Curated annotation (Swiss-Prot):
GO terms for biological process: carbon utilization; rRNA base methylation. The lineage of its organism: Bacteria, Pseudomonadati, Pseudomonadota, Gammaproteobacteria, Enterobacterales. This is Ribosomal RNA large subunit methyltransferase J. Belongs to the RlmJ family. HAMAP family: 23SrRNA_methyltr_J. Recombinant protein prefers protein-free 23S rRNA to ribonucleoprotein particles containing only part of the 50S subunit proteins and does not methylate the assembled 50S subunit. Recognizes a minimal substrate corresponding to helix 72; this shows that RlmJ requires only a small hairpin for activity and this suggests that RlmJ can methylate A2030 before the 23S RNA is completely transcribed, processed and folded. Cannot modify single-stranded DNA having the same sequence as H72. Specifically methylates the adenine in position 2030 of 23S rRNA. Nascent 23S rRNA seems to be the natural substrate. Appears to be not necessary for ribosome assembly. Required for the utilization of extracellular DNA as the sole source of carbon and energy. Changing Y4F: 40-fold reduction in catalytic activity. Disruption phenotype: The inactivation of the this gene results in the complete loss of A2030 modification, but does not cause the accumulation of ribosome assembly intermediates. The phenotype of rlmJ knockout gene is very mild under various growth conditions and at the stationary phase, except for a small growth advantage in anaerobic conditions. Only minor changes in the total E.coli proteome can be observed in a cell devoid of the 23S rRNA nucleotide A2030 methylation. Mutants show a stationary-phase competition defect during coculture with wild-type cells. It comes from Escherichia coli (strain K12). Changing K18R: 10-fold reduction in catalytic activity. Its EC number is 2.1.1.266. The active site is at D164 (proton acceptor).
Length: 280
């Protein structure tokens, strides 16, 4: 089942949260000269036209990136991420949104590498064309969850693994946990960043319970809700679960989340939280 297209949702509040966390982790990894791997299990098309029929049909970016990218009081924690967005929109008009692979491409250094996977028959060729001239990147049409077995550990023994499946199938909620467990067996020092949507809170509670049962330590949860939990409204919140987070990430997100919530949710509904699922 491959009906999900991220082009309908690019630049929404969930992307803002995901890419804020992604960029902060990458910037942290760059503090050491040693190279690292960026592995993206569900990479998407790479770049999204916000004037496309898909994006215009939902207009989700108007309540996401459009609300923050030109703010004068932008927190320092958002600079790396927003600078990438501005790089793709030099005219000052918000026309393109960079997905996680393009954010990584701009932030990574010459010595770092990218391993990108996408299975969707329409998105894979777009992703491949984005990276055809980038010698640091390897793009594959494959099952993203299998990459957690096949591509780990990296030679450098340093890396960020971003896992953000579409959750089209309910089994994805179990697949992310088993995939992380497999990856962790091979690469216990890697940073794993798992994105999740809150559609039914019970699914997330079950997923977190299963993750706790793996015995993995150092699991940080970051969540941004635009509406209260509901079983009728679709996605009301999204979150990032980070295993082995950089030591600064908790404080950075505590600094920036209240600002993001105030800009993205002017009505003040929902919540913004940073908490440990499992401490060290």
């Amino acid at each position: 089942m491959l009906s999900y297209r991220h082009s309908f949702h690019a630049g929404n509040h969930a992307d803002v949260l995901k890419h804020t966390v992604q960029s902060l982790i990458i910037e942290s990894l760059k503090e050491k000269d040693k190279p690292f791997l960026y592995l993206d299990t569900h990479a998407g098309a790479g770049r999204y036209q916000l004037g496309s029929e898909h994006a215009e049909r939902t207009g989700e970016y108007l309540e996401g990136i459009a609300r923050i990218w030109q703010q004068d009081d932008l927190p320092a924690e958002l600079e790396a991420y927003i600078n990438v967005v501005k790089h793709f929109n030099r005219s000052g008009q918000l026309r393109y949104y960079p997905g996680s692979p393009l954010i990584a491409r701009l932030l990574l250094r010459e010595q770092d590498s990218l391993q990108l996977t996408e299975l969707h028959p329409s998105d894979y060729p777009l992703l491949r064309s984005e990276f055809q001239k980038d010698s640091r990147a390897r793009v594959e049409k494959a099952d993203g969850f299998q990459q957690l077995k096949a591509k780990l550990p990296p030679v450098s023994r340093r890396g960020l693994i971003l896992i953000d499946p579409p959750y089209e199938m309910k089994t994805d909620y179990q697949a992310v946990v088993s995939g992380i467990a497999e990856g962790y067996k091979r690469f216990a020092t890697g940073i794993y960043a798992l994105w999740y949507p809150v559609v039914l809170r019970q699914q997330i509670k079950r997923m977190i319970h299963d993750l706790e049962a793996t015995g993995i330590r150092k699991i940080l949860q970051i969540e941004l809700a635009v509406l209260p939990d509901s079983d009728r409204r679709g996605m009301t919140a999204s979150g990032m679960i980070v295993i082995n987070p950089p030591w600064k990430l908790e404080q950075q997100m505590n600094n920036v989340l209240p600002w993001l919530h105030s800009k993205l949710v002017p009505a003040g509904t929902g919540h913004a939280t940073v908490s440990w699922i499992v401490p060290e």
